[in-house]
């Protein structure tokens, strides 16, 4: 995963988004629906209707980057549409992209002894 620079916020657009959208239409959605500046350097995440596809748009100061991830199994856990827009930490973004519940991450069990 590409590391998120310090001070960059990660925004989740609640609800579902048409995953056919590209740079221009996702940037417009950031402006009009989320009421944020798509050129500010923050990451904006969008999830498709089925929940297994995620797009992240980010302007790094030189140009726009569009990242896409599709889960082979399962769905990305997403906030309810009533929340409008949610901000998460870069660590929570790592959990989200791994398919882990970013709201309540739990340590996985590790054996303490052999045998």
Short names for language-model regions:
Residues 1-115:
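Polybasic/polar functional segments that serve as interface/processing modules
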């Amino acid at each position: 995963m590409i590391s998120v620079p310090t001070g960059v916020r990660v925004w989740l657009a609640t609800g579902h988004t048409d995953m056919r959208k590209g740079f221009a239409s996702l940037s417009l959605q950031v402006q009009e629906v989320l009421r944020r500046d798509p050129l500010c350097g923050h990451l904006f995440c969008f999830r498709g209707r089925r929940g297994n596809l995620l797009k992240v748009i980010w302007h790094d100061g030189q140009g726009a980057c569009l990242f896409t991830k599709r889960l082979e199994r399962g769905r990305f856990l997403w906030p309810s549409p009533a929340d409008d827009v949610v901000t998460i930490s870069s660590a929570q973004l790592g959990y989200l992209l791994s398919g882990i519940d970013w709201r309540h991450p739990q340590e996985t069990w590790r054996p303490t002894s052999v045998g």
